[in-house]
Amino acid sequence: MKIKDKKLHRIASTAIIYRKTKGEIKYIITQRSLEENAFPGMWTVPGGTLETDDYINTQKTTKDQWYFGLEKSLRGEIREEVNLDVGKIKYLLDIVFIRPDGMPVVILSWYCPYKSGRVKLDEDNIDYAWVTYPEAKKYDLIEGILEEIAMVDKILKGKNKDSVQYRC
């Protein structure tokens, strides 16, 4: 596989959004449009890629830098894709892969509680569901999403994050 630029990576982030309802922990998943180039019709979680427009036209935190650019970008993607606001965003894990076009990609996966809003999907998604971890197993999820939901489920139920392993 030919890599375009070994130092250049596309950066994306995803959010495992949860809410506690009647003693159950539920997670929002969305079904991608059938017109999507990658994983059409499959189920996933909200997220997207970091673009310079996400921060370049905002006030810098220091003379030369923008702090929390990725978090602001992820919050914007969540609002855009499902119209929700979330609470504190916590780091879960990172994923790296190389797209078929040779572009290296870094995905940072986060988890956060639902805070407010009513779900309204954008044009990139055609359906959504709030599901428990066992219910999520019934959906055609993009590879790895179920395992990430399982990790968050264990964390939220008081199991040690360090004891959760993903095929290592």
What kind of region is each of these model predictions?
Residues 85-88, 93-118:
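Active-site-adjacent beta-strand/loop module that shapes the phosphate/pyrophosphate-binding cleft
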Residues 17-19, 31, 109-113, 132:
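Short, well-ordered beta-strand micro-motif
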Residues 41-43, 48-53, 109, 121-168:
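Nudix hydrolase/Nudix homology domain
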Residues 9, 66, 70, 104-106:
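Residue-level preference for beta-strand/loop junctions
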Residues 77, 81-85:
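Short alpha-helical functional segments enriched in proximate histidine and acidic residues
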Residues 12-13, 69-70, 126:
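Short loop/turn microsegments at loop-to-beta-strand junctions
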Residues 24-76:
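Conserved Nudix-box catalytic region and its N-terminal flanking loop in Nudix hydrolases
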Residues 1-23, 35:
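Acidic, metal-coordinating catalytic segment for phosphate/diphosphate chemistry
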